[in-house]
Amino acid sequence: MKFYLVGGAVRDMLLGITPKDKDWVVVGATEDEMLANGFIKIAANFPVFIHPQTKQEYALARSEKKTRNGYHGFEVNFSKYITL
């Protein structure tokens, strides 16, 4: 299980600004492993978790494939074998 800082926190740090919040992507983990490590799932249909102490957001790495027209026409894969 590896954790990578992503999103606005990375941008802010590159600009020399202290990030207000930090979001993380998790590689090499399953939903069950996250729960077993004390993370709290916050999304019903998406593996996004909150760290119990820091309250920072952690999302499992994913791949997406366009399958249909429109905003919802995607197939999403959350395998622990997805890399960045």
Swiss-Prot record:
<keyword id="KW-0460">Magnesium</keyword>
<dbReference type="GO" id="GO:0005524">
    <property type="term" value="F:ATP binding"/>
</dbReference>
<feature type="binding site">
    <location>
        <position position="21"/>
    </location>
    <ligand>
        <name>Mg(2+)</name>
    </ligand>
</feature>
<dbReference type="InterPro" id="IPR043519">
    <property type="entry name" value="NT_sf"/>
</dbReference>
<keyword id="KW-0548">Nucleotidyltransferase</keyword>
<dbReference type="GO" id="GO:0046872">
    <property type="term" value="F:metal ion binding"/>
</dbReference>
<feature type="binding site">
    <location>
        <position position="8"/>
    </location>
    <ligand>
        <name>ATP</name>
    </ligand>
</feature>
<feature type="binding site">
    <location>
        <position position="11"/>
    </location>
    <ligand>
        <name>ATP</name>
    </ligand>
</feature>
<dbReference type="InterPro" id="IPR002646">
    <property type="entry name" value="PolA_pol_head_dom"/>
</dbReference>
<keyword id="KW-0479">Metal-binding</keyword>
<comment type="similarity">
    <text>Belongs to the tRNA nucleotidyltransferase/poly(A) polymerase family.</text>
</comment>
<comment type="function">
    <text>Catalyzes the addition and repair of the essential 3'-terminal CCA sequence in tRNAs without using a nucleic acid template. Adds these three nucleotides in the order of C, C, and A to the tRNA nucleotide-73, using CTP and ATP as substrates and producing inorganic pyrophosphate. tRNA 3'-terminal CCA addition is required both for tRNA processing and repair. Also involved in tRNA surveillance by mediating tandem CCA addition to generate a CCACCA at the 3' terminus of unstable tRNAs. While stable tRNAs receive only 3'-terminal CCA, unstable tRNAs are marked with CCACCA and rapidly degraded.</text>
</comment>
<feature type="binding site">
    <location>
        <position position="11"/>
    </location>
    <ligand>
        <name>CTP</name>
    </ligand>
</feature>
<keyword id="KW-0547">Nucleotide-binding</keyword>
<feature type="binding site">
    <location>
        <position position="23"/>
    </location>
    <ligand>
        <name>Mg(2+)</name>
    </ligand>
</feature>
<dbReference type="Pfam" id="PF01743">
    <property type="entry name" value="PolyA_pol"/>
</dbReference>
<keyword id="KW-0067">ATP-binding</keyword>
<keyword id="KW-0819">tRNA processing</keyword>
<protein>
    <recommendedName>
        <fullName>CCA tRNA nucleotidyltransferase</fullName>
        <ecNumber>2.7.7.72</ecNumber>
    </recommendedName>
</protein>
<dbReference type="GO" id="GO:0003723">
    <property type="term" value="F:RNA binding"/>
</dbReference>
<keyword id="KW-0694">RNA-binding</keyword>
<dbReference type="GO" id="GO:0008033">
    <property type="term" value="P:tRNA processing"/>
</dbReference>
<dbReference type="GO" id="GO:0004810">
    <property type="term" value="F:CCA tRNA nucleotidyltransferase activity"/>
</dbReference>
<dbReference type="InterPro" id="IPR050124">
    <property type="entry name" value="tRNA_CCA-adding_enzyme"/>
</dbReference>
<keyword id="KW-0808">Transferase</keyword>
<feature type="binding site">
    <location>
        <position position="8"/>
    </location>
    <ligand>
        <name>CTP</name>
    </ligand>
</feature>
